[in-house]
Amino acid sequence: MNRRIYFQCLLLVLPLALLPAATWGKTVVRGKAGAIVELPCQSSQKRNSVFNWKHANQVKILGNQGSSSSSFWLKGNSPLSNRVESKKNMWDQGSFPLVIKDLRMDDSGTYICEVGDKKMEVELLVFRLTANPNTRLLHGQSLTLTLEGPSVGSPSVQWKSPENKIIETGPTCSMPKLRLQDSGTWSCHLSFQDQNKLELDIKIIVLGFPKASATVYKKEGEQVEFSFPLNFEDESLSGELMWQVDGASSAQSWVSFSLEDRKVSVQKILPDLKIQMSKGLPLSLTLPQALHRYAGSGNLSLTLDKGKLHQQVSLVMLKVTQVKNKLTCEVLGPIDPKMKLSLKLEDQEAKVSTQKMVQVLDPKAGTWQCLLSSGDQVLLESKADVLATGLSHQQPTLLAGALGGTAGLVLFAGLCIYCCVKCRHRRHQAQRMSQIKKLLSEKKTCQCPHRLQKTYNLL
């Protein structure tokens, strides 16, 4: 009876013995496209072991040959032959890994490691991230990131931005309008049912202006500089600054230029506009003097192969005028609605307005101060001196009359003095002539030469 049972068991085990090798099971390895992955293969035999790595279709990838001291690997006819190797220093430890470099999506599949009469299956799953339309985009453009790879295991997916914020979950991540803060490394975190995890990343570069807009506050006569720094330097582009003066119905082109190899070439400048442009980066424009007719806003547009970039720029100025009995402080150029305009006499209460103009009727004499402020910060300041209000209406007429009267008196006094001096001189001369004639008639004149000469001079 025991022999019969033994014989039946032998018949059951015999087919297994006829198999070419025993299968250890399947190991799953996950990798990232472009990276390096190591497929494991372990054996209890540590020396003089012969191993071979094959595809599922039995095409040889790599194996060893020779004794333990002089063993070397041989590559087969696999498409991976130029991207695979093994770690020879680990063979004596019973480890025969297959190292695959520069992973590709089509490397996913089943790999078989045969050591002696045993074999091990390794399932390689390759994943990658793709960016549409590109990894280098302009500020304001849209971006879609997609996870590609085998659907085996259905991992849970989580996306994180360069700011380490969780954006979305799922195989895709969409950003309809990119910000400059979105420039950097985006990561995709995969969690599998076997508790293993995989992290993939992709670098996104967002090109643009670090500042969305720029406002310059200047007093009349000061130099104005518009600066347009960029977060890139290696792009060729063309640009134009369109400017709309405050109160104008349309904008006009102030300057057009091109940038190539980090050098700026000016194409055209508005006639009679004294403006200078930098010859390199960062882009900048300079007005020698701020004039009221320049106050307004503009749009700098840059045209690149990938699209267009825009930046708003403004020039804000203050204008203080006095017409008859009215003192006016006015803002020229665009301002934030939260800004305040104030007009005050020194040490007096200010008249404040959120509009672009503030006026004072019959202003008192003194120094008036016009301020444009945002919160506690003073952005612009202008001063005006006002004379006494009592003279404000009649001052020009009275001044002209006073000046005319004074001039008349001076002329009259001068004429009188001249006439008096002239008469006195003539009377004195007549008296002298009379005296000389009398002396001559009486023959009492001196005959000395010097006296004769004096007499002749008098005559």
UniProtKB/Swiss-Prot annotation:
Domain Ig-like C2-type intervals: 130-208, 209-318, 319-374
Subcellular location: Cell membrane
Gene Ontology terms: biological process: adaptive immune response; cell adhesion; T cell differentiation; T cell selection
Signal peptide: 1-25
InterPro entries registered for this protein in UniProt: CD4 (IPR000973), CD4-extracel (IPR015274), Ig-like_dom (IPR007110), Ig-like_dom_sf (IPR036179), Ig-like_fold (IPR013783), Ig_C2-set (IPR008424), Ig_sub (IPR003599), Ig_V-set (IPR013106)
Disulfide pairings: C41-C113, C329-C370
Residue spans, topological domain Cytoplasmic: 420-459
Record-level GO cellular component terms: cell surface; plasma membrane
Pfam families reported for this sequence: C2-set, CD4-extracel, ig, Tcell_CD4_C
Transmembrane segments: 397-419
Glycosylation sites: N299
Extracellular topology ranges: 26-396
The keyword Transmembrane is assigned to this record: yes
Function: Integral membrane glycoprotein that plays an essential role in the immune response and serves multiple functions in responses against both external and internal offenses. In T-cells, functions primarily as a coreceptor for MHC class II molecule:peptide complex. The antigens presented by class II peptides are derived from extracellular proteins while class I peptides are derived from cytosolic proteins. Interacts simultaneously with the T-cell receptor (TCR) and the MHC class II presented by antigen presenting cells (APCs).
Name assigned to this protein: T-cell surface glycoprotein CD4
Source organism (scientific name): Oryctolagus cuniculus (Rabbit)
